[in-house]
Design a protein with these regions (language model features):
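Functional-site microenvironments in short loops/helix caps that host divalent-cation chemistry
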Residues: 1-118, 125, 142-150
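Short, structured beta-strand segments at or near domain termini in extracellular proteins/domains
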Residues: 127-143
Length: 151
């Protein structure tokens, strides 16, 4: 989120002052339907954030292509680490873990932050893990992201 906010919307709260939830997650112990969905919800049900983006938290946790290591990103020197390893069938099971980010419909609000990191085993389908299409912004030589016009 912006300015140290743990969530991708303006407030540090998970629901508005009118009681409307900002994302699909488990708001109460054992209560999966309080936010209006039993499991995953349709895209766009919750309000967009200040950038006009929908569903940036909750609903499903996100698969990443990054290998899960216990030490986390602290052991990597890059600001946007991408540690790859395509485990073979005969590799030990611990080498088949991929990092999962954010939380899902089955998780409490503390886990729907994109900073939350866990793992699942590759090639193991889960109803609470999905993916987002992302790409790296390519900068020109002046350090802009190509959004503005060049003079």
């Amino acid at each position: 989120g912006k300015s140290g906010n743990p969530f991708p919307w303006e407030s540090g709260e998970v629901k508005s002052d009118k009681g409307c939830f900002y994302a699909n997650f488990k708001p109460d112990r054992g209560n999966y339907t309080m936010d209006g969905s039993l499991i995953t919800s349709k895209c766009g049900i919750f309000s967009a954030n200040s950038n006009g983006l929908y569903d940036m938290a909750g609903n499903v946790a996100e698969w990443t292509s990054t290998v899960y290591v216990e030490s986390g990103v602290e052991s990597m020197s890059d600001m946007n680490p991408d540690l790859k390893y395509n485990a073979a069938k005969e590799d030990p099971y611990r080498l088949k873990r991929k990092s999962v980010r954010g939380g899902s419909w089955k998780d409490p609000e503390s886990l729907i932050r994109s900073a939350w990191r866990g793992y699942e085993y590759q090639n193991q389908p889960r109803s609470y893990v999905g993916f987002r299409c992302v790409r790296t912004m390519i900068s020109d030589t002046r350090g802009t992201s190509g959004r503005g016009k060049k003079k």
